[in-house]
Structures are given as structure tokens and as C-alpha cells.
Amino acid sequence: ELSFLNNGVKIHLADLRKGKDEVFQFAGGVSGFVDFINRDKTKIHDNCFYTNKTVTVNPEENINVEVAMQWTDGYTENFLAYTNNIPQKDGGTHVNGLRSAMTAVIKRYIEESEFAKKEKIDLTGEDIREGLTCVLSLKMPEPKFSSQTKDKLVSSEARPAVEQVVRTALESYLQENPKDARIICEKIMDAARAREAARKARETTRRKGLLGSAGLPGKLADCSERDRSLCEVFLVEGDSAGGSAKQ
């Protein structure tokens, strides 16, 4: 982790008792970290998103934001966040800032592209982060954490700094890499469709369960209208007649 989070640093560990030594040095910073994490995964696009920028939050304080992201064909999110090389397994304000900026930029990009013309899908942050591998590294003076274990960052100035850097860089990335942007957006749209299909399947199962518990006939078709004052019951003879009645 340290060799990835501190680009250019070479770490040499030697055990003189056993004559063993290990050298850790990786190029690319957190971008190389993402590539290392995805080494056994199927990456759906070639160009890894990467940005490294320092933001001035007040005359005496600078925050360095380094982010790398790449989507795979998986269904789970792999998100690693660090502040001054300390990992935050519970996230914090820096993670909230990144997710907020990423969701806003990608949703706007899809709405303004040809995807929105084909179909209208309400995207969520979970849809956008499906299959995502992301490493966020923050360098800032005097960070504040929720506890002594430092598992969650609570410094309020971290969120706007990360949002600013990620929003600008991600907008440029999508415009400059249209092929990768299309692949990423198609992956996100597929995730949204799957979520919506699962929701409808759950609703159908619950409705059927309610009908079954009421002792109604198994061939009774569900109502397409939710307002019961507008619903009617049609009694027809035979399955073929039932199909015609539904139409």
C-alpha cells in the first residue's frame, strides 16, 4: 500500500537474521494500485481514470487529492480510501465528496447523450458504482477522524475539495475518452435495468402471495390499475377467452 500511495518511494525491507529481503516500488501511484487490484479481473475499458491535484482550501491549508477509477465486469464495488496513508474502512467526508461528484457528472453525461434519447432510466449511485474499483488518497494537514482507530474521516473541508477535483477531472475524462465513456455508461445502464427488473419481480411475487393467501383462484390475473375504485372483475370461459379479456 505505502509504495502505491507514495509514488516514487522505494521501500527495502531486510531480515539480516535469515538473509531475506523484499523491495517494494510501484510506478503509477494509485493508478498502479487500481491496476494491481484488477490484475485478476476483467476490465471493461482500457483507460483508467486518474487525477492528482492540490486544492487550496484556505490561505494556510492545501489538500492533495489523488484518485484512480476503473470499471470491471463484476457486480460489487471495491473502494479503498486513505488519508495521509491511513486507511478509512468506514469512508468519511472524502468518500462522500467523490461519490457525490461522480454520480452527478455521470448522470448528467448520460442525460445529455444519446442514451437518454433511447430510454429513460432513473440511475442511482449504486448503479454507477457497480463493478467499480476505486482508490482515493488524500494528503492534508491535521485531519479529523471519528475515533482513535481513524476508520472514518470527518474533516468538513475534505468533501468540497474532493468534489471539485473529481468533478472537473471526470468531466474531461468522459469527453476525451468517448469509447471508454460509452462502455462505462452501458455497464451502468445495464445495472439500472437489472435493479428495476428485480424490483418488479419482487412486487409481482408479493402480489401473488397476497392473492394466494386470500384463497382466490390461481388463474385470477393481477390488476394493472392500482386504484381499486377503477378495477373490475371479468368472468370468462376458457384460457383463450381469458387472454382476449386481458387485451
What are these regions (language model features)?
Residues 1-247:
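GHKL-family ATPase ATP-binding module
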